[in-house]
UniProtKB/Swiss-Prot annotation:
NADP(+) binds at residues 125-129, 183-185, 235-236, 308-314. It catalyses: L-pipecolate + NADP(+) = Delta(1)-piperideine-2-carboxylate + NADPH + H(+); L-proline + NADP(+) = 1-pyrroline-2-carboxylate + NADPH + H(+); N-methyl-L-alanine + NADP(+) + H2O = methylamine + pyruvate + NADPH + H(+). This is Delta(1)-pyrroline-2-carboxylate/Delta(1)-piperideine-2-carboxylate reductase. Keywords: NADP, Oxidoreductase. It comes from Pseudomonas putida (Arthrobacter siderocapsulatus). Homodimer.
Length: 341
């Protein structure tokens, strides 16, 4: 999770930030429905301290829309495929509106069958992944999602990049506690965090990436300008990244991370790939005991010395934001106003 820049920080009410972001999306070609979904996602990331996926992303969204690479007016096409399977053609638009269009059907299937799969293809995902799964856990369901991105990661033992950062997000209910939620790239670092470090003139820890010659580097600009990221944990992260390619692209009908070509759309930033979401109803197995067992696990992890659960920092940031407003820098706020025009 990245920190905001060193510019003066101001606090903005969440609803005010969300409204501003929605207006920007609509100003640059998104329908009201699409703009509303994207604005909530982006504002939520900023609120929770995930700055690499918050308002930092807005110039990329705008340049992508201007390039014609993504359709901000797309209407997702939902197909009820089987008792536990839903398929969505995002119609060249963003993945989050596709999820929103299929969500009610997906939840109904998961509650009935015990498990349901949502396969999204022909979609663009440029955001944090945890907002896609956390709401399911708030309803007592377990959710897992994977999405592949653009080629920027060298598989372990390989010489050239092939995979995307290929994140995995998971959410589960926990009795008398916030849901257990994590969202992690299978690369050593999120691509957005590399961009933020480059903008700030900061060096990266060792083991994050390589330069254009395949040599290890701590220079984020070298990684972005012809270099590549490494998978986390060597062969283990590489295997998980491969799994994401199979689930998010091969299974859904989406593009692999290397299969699309945006060279004809200068300014395009959003990967045109796929997403898979699996939702499980624990009530079909352990019933209400599952949330209690989740709580038991948390308590035992804390008892052995764990001081921060996955996702806990986000909840703390959220609590502060609810009282004081969402943290944005004056520079970021001015940039948003300029995007609005």
């Amino acid at each position: 999770m990245s920190a905001p820049s060193t510019s003066t920080v101001v606090r903005v009410p969440f609803t005010e930030l969300q409204s501003l972001l929605q207006a920007i999306f609509q100003r640059h070609g998104c329908s009201e429905a699409v703009a509303r979904v994207l604005a909530h996602n982006c504002a939520s990331a900023q609120r929770d301290g995930a700055h690499s996926h918050g308002v930092f992303r807005m110039p990329g969204y705008v340049s992508t829309l201007a390039s014609g690479w993504v359709d901000g007016q797309a209407t997702p096409q939902v197909s009820d495929v089987a008792a536990g399977y839903v398929r969505v053609d995002a119609a060249g638009g963003f993945a989050q509106p596709a999820l929103a269009a299929a969500r009610e059907l997906l939840v109904a299937k998961a509650r009935s069958a015990g498990i349901a799969v949502l396969a999204i293809h022909n979609s663009h995902h440029f955001a944090a992944l945890w907002p896609d799964v956390e709401p399911f856990a708030e309803e007592g369901l377990v959710a897992l999602s994977v999405v592949n991105s653009m080629t920027c990661v060298v598989p372990h033992g390989a010489r050239k990049p092939l995979f995307g950062t290929n994140p995995i997000a998971f959410a589960a209910p926990c009795a008398e506690h916030d849901p257990i939620v994590f969202d992690m790239a299978t690369s050593a670092m999120a691509h957005g965090d590399v961009q933020i470090a480059a903008r700030a003139g900061q060096q990266l820890p060792e083991g994050m990436g390589v330069d254009a010659d395949g040599q290890p580097t701590t220079d984020p600009k070298a990684i972005l300008e012809g270099g590549a990221l490494l998978p986390f944990g060597g062969h283990k992260g590489s295997a998980l990244s491969m799994m994401v390619e199979l689930l998010a692209a091969a299974l859904t009908g989406g593009h692999f991370s290397w299969e699309f070509d945006w060279s004809g759309h200068p300014g395009a930033k959003t990967p045109w790939t796929g997403q898979l979401i699996i939702v499980i109803n624990p009530g079909k197995a352990e019933g209400e005991r599952f949330a209690q067992r989740s709580r038991e696990l948390v308590e035992h992890m804390q008892a052995v010395g764990l001081t921060r659960m996955p996702g806990e920092r986000r909840y703390r940031e959220r609590e502060v934001a609810e009282e004081e407003g969402v943290a944005v820098t004056e520079q970021e706020l001015q940039g948003l106003k300029e995007l609005l025009g």
